[in-house]
Amino acid sequence: MSPILGYWKIKGLVQPTRLLLEYLEEKYEEHLYERDEGDKWRNKKFELGLEFPNLPYYIDGDVKLTQSMAIIRYIADKHNMLGGCPKERAEISMLEGAVLDIRYGVSRIAYSKDFETLKVDFLSKLPEMLKMFEDRLCHKTYLNGDHVTHPDFMLYDALDVVLYMDPMCLDAFPKLVCFKKRIEAIPQIDKYLKSSKYIAWPLQGWQATFGGGDHPPK
């Protein structure tokens, strides 16, 4: 039986996990909850055998996980992608945290009615965060070298999100522009992005001021 990935029918916290699974060509079944299916999830959440019931969840045989980072790390670990030595494992963990500084930074303001005001401060700090990744990629194909690791998909997702906030935010970062195109050119990812499985919108929950609703801004 294929593993089950359960989440809202949005990008949200689980999009990097979807990208990783597609890259690995690992068969999985998605249980997607629509905008109006909150009651469906609440009625089901305690019937799945999850120790800490929440969305997203991942069920792989007797392994039943929640929390997005636990899920993506588990999948990476299954495929020996967490690093071959303590230094490499620590660097991969560091990269996770650095990407989450951007992604969670967006999420913290995305639901506020004062988003437009808060966005100004976020965008003023964004170049400093992006420059660190630009420098990291100066002599690397991917964040950890020549091989893809899960923080690459986390960064790809974060870049996708901030480009909706400011379409010119990568103009000063050619390495990041190339990195994003490189991820999209991976055959498995290219196929996924063009498939009906790909969820383009919303970026956040439907109720979010930024990245919410049923359709992207024109």
Curated annotation (Swiss-Prot):
<feature type="binding site">
    <location>
        <begin position="7"/>
        <end position="8"/>
    </location>
    <ligand>
        <name>glutathione</name>
    </ligand>
</feature>
<dbReference type="Pfam" id="PF02798">
    <property type="entry name" value="GST_N"/>
</dbReference>
<feature type="binding site">
    <location>
        <position position="111"/>
    </location>
    <ligand>
        <name>substrate</name>
    </ligand>
</feature>
<comment type="function">
    <text>Conjugation of reduced glutathione to a wide number of exogenous and endogenous hydrophobic electrophiles.</text>
</comment>
<dbReference type="GO" id="GO:0006749">
    <property type="term" value="P:glutathione metabolic process"/>
</dbReference>
<comment type="similarity">
    <text>Belongs to the GST superfamily. Mu family.</text>
</comment>
<dbReference type="GO" id="GO:0004364">
    <property type="term" value="F:glutathione transferase activity"/>
</dbReference>
<feature type="domain" description="GST N-terminal">
    <location>
        <begin position="2"/>
        <end position="83"/>
    </location>
</feature>
<dbReference type="InterPro" id="IPR036249">
    <property type="entry name" value="Thioredoxin-like_sf"/>
</dbReference>
<feature type="binding site">
    <location>
        <begin position="41"/>
        <end position="45"/>
    </location>
    <ligand>
        <name>glutathione</name>
    </ligand>
</feature>
<dbReference type="InterPro" id="IPR050213">
    <property type="entry name" value="GST_superfamily"/>
</dbReference>
<dbReference type="InterPro" id="IPR004046">
    <property type="entry name" value="GST_C"/>
</dbReference>
<keyword id="KW-0808">Transferase</keyword>
<feature type="domain" description="GST C-terminal">
    <location>
        <begin position="85"/>
        <end position="203"/>
    </location>
</feature>
<dbReference type="Pfam" id="PF14497">
    <property type="entry name" value="GST_C_3"/>
</dbReference>
<feature type="binding site">
    <location>
        <begin position="67"/>
        <end position="68"/>
    </location>
    <ligand>
        <name>glutathione</name>
    </ligand>
</feature>
<comment type="function">
    <text>GST isoenzymes appear to play a central role in the parasite detoxification system. Other functions are also suspected including a role in increasing the solubility of haematin in the parasite gut.</text>
</comment>
<dbReference type="InterPro" id="IPR036282">
    <property type="entry name" value="Glutathione-S-Trfase_C_sf"/>
</dbReference>
<feature type="binding site">
    <location>
        <begin position="54"/>
        <end position="55"/>
    </location>
    <ligand>
        <name>glutathione</name>
    </ligand>
</feature>
<dbReference type="InterPro" id="IPR040079">
    <property type="entry name" value="Glutathione_S-Trfase"/>
</dbReference>
<dbReference type="InterPro" id="IPR010987">
    <property type="entry name" value="Glutathione-S-Trfase_C-like"/>
</dbReference>
<protein>
    <recommendedName>
        <fullName>Glutathione S-transferase class-mu 26 kDa isozyme</fullName>
        <ecNumber>2.5.1.18</ecNumber>
    </recommendedName>
</protein>
<dbReference type="InterPro" id="IPR004045">
    <property type="entry name" value="Glutathione_S-Trfase_N"/>
</dbReference>
<comment type="subunit">
    <text>Homodimer.</text>
</comment>
